[in-house]
Amino acid sequence: MTAAHKVKITYCAECGYEPQTLDLAKALMLEFGARLSSIELIPWEGGTFEVSVDGQLIHSMKRDGGFGDSAAIKDAVRTRLAG
């Protein structure tokens, strides 16, 4: 099975969000590894922390508040991968 799903995590580098970003990336790799073709980490600014799958935003710090629960983000990724 060829994985075609791409996850993108855009985070505020100037805010020091690297630990949360790396923790989430690791959790997603452990949970979905072979089902993903890539997990792209994009340093940004302005308090940004966003997670998208195949271009669809599934979590935004500004929209949803905070970093989000990793279990909830994994559920959203799972839903997106399912269909």
Regions found by a protein language model. Name each.
Residues 18-20, 50, 62:
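Generic domain-boundary/flexible-linker signal
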Residues 2-28, 32, 45, 81:
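Short, thiol/selenol-centered motifs that function as redox-active sites or metal-ligating centers
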Residues 10-14, 56, 61-63:
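Short strand-loop junctions, especially beta-strand C-caps/beta-turns
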Residues 36-40:
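A short linear hydrophobic-aromatic micro-motif
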Residues 58-82:
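Non-catalytic, surface beta->alpha helical segment in thiol-disulfide oxidoreductase systems
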Residues 44-50:
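Structural micro-motif
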